């Protein structure tokens, strides 16, 4: 049996025709799933019993089990722990803003990028999520919240461009009129810098915001915290980013996790300012999430403020990310790890 959430409208239309059904039935079924949040074929009232029988024999609607659902008492952030059909566990985070609801989704179970400050990569890669599994995070998030999700950030567990085909299919369905109809300009994809895939994505001329996890201003320093730096230099990443800007007209976001004594000095800020000066970009400064498995500590408020103000002297737009959901382990990978460990399960 196949997860119907892995299908585009054209693919489901083709299946309908191959199985003696009218192609327009595909749109009706997706209306039930994406517009009416009905996740059971039997409840689709304008679908014949015969077709429901065929659907039930060939497909399932892959909505995961909700294992845990936490709400922050500080800012209303929600953390959802989900169980997949194969026993694996993923997580997503819903953040409430004045402009609407945003969800941070995972794209892989674990991650093989090995970034030193990230909890989701500690035990390596388990497997990629399918397009439908990524979609299910948004669907279950909306269902639990009881409100529309208007923004998506691909910043949860996993490297999205390491799961390129499934992520591109997810973006197609989530953006489509028949899907969740979320505009590409309301979607941000974060990558540690897989240069060929950045260029491939640029050639699609999508309007998705590209966010680069930079975190250091020299290749030498970046190699100590991000193994991907051994493969792609900062210069190569910036060239790919400029190509993305040229093809899409979209501003790039650079994410920079501030780690005390590692990359947070005034000289680091000056180097970053010189590196990005004149580029169509924005820098998102992130106080690092402290985890037990490493000794990284957050920069002081004073050092963060100095870093921010120094960047601005170079004409580089920058802000400090507001920490959300800290009381519920909202950073990517943290809740999954703590849950699995508490149950004595294997990561």
Swiss-Prot record:
This is Probable dual-specificity RNA methyltransferase RlmN. It is found in: Cytoplasm. The active site is at 91 (proton acceptor), 332 (s-methylcysteine intermediate). Binds 1 [4Fe-4S] cluster. The cluster is coordinated with 3 cysteines and an exchangeable S-adenosyl-L-methionine. Reaction proceeds by a ping-pong mechanism involving intermediate methylation of a conserved cysteine residue. Its main location: cytoplasm. Belongs to the radical SAM superfamily. RlmN family. Residues 97-327 form the Radical SAM core domain. It catalyses: adenosine(2503) in 23S rRNA + 2 reduced [2Fe-2S]-[ferredoxin] + 2 S-adenosyl-L-methionine = 2-methyladenosine(2503) in 23S rRNA + 5'-deoxyadenosine + L-methionine + 2 oxidized [2Fe-2S]-[ferredoxin] + S-adenosyl-L-homocysteine; adenosine(37) in tRNA + 2 reduced [2Fe-2S]-[ferredoxin] + 2 S-adenosyl-L-methionine = 2-methyladenosine(37) in tRNA + 5'-deoxyadenosine + L-methionine + 2 oxidized [2Fe-2S]-[ferredoxin] + S-adenosyl-L-homocysteine. One of its GO terms (molecular function) is rRNA (adenine(2503)-C2-)-methyltransferase activity. S-adenosyl-L-methionine binds at residues 158-159, 190, 213-215, 289. Disulfide bonds join 104-332. Specifically methylates position 2 of adenine 2503 in 23S rRNA and position 2 of adenine 37 in tRNAs. One of its GO terms (cellular component) is cytoplasm. Its EC number is 2.1.1.192. [4Fe-4S] cluster binds at residues 111, 115, 118. It comes from Clostridium perfringens (strain SM101 / Type A). Keywords: 4Fe-4S, Cytoplasm, Disulfide bond, Iron, Iron-sulfur, Metal-binding, Methyltransferase, rRNA processing, S-adenosyl-L-methionine, Transferase, tRNA processing. It comes from the Bacteria. Its cofactor is [4Fe-4S] cluster. GO terms for biological process: rRNA base methylation; tRNA methylation. InterPro entries: Aldolase_TIM, Elp3/MiaA/NifB-like_rSAM, Methyltransferase_A, RlmN_N, RNA_MTrfase_RlmN, rRNA_lsu_MTrfase_RlmN/Cfr, rSAM.
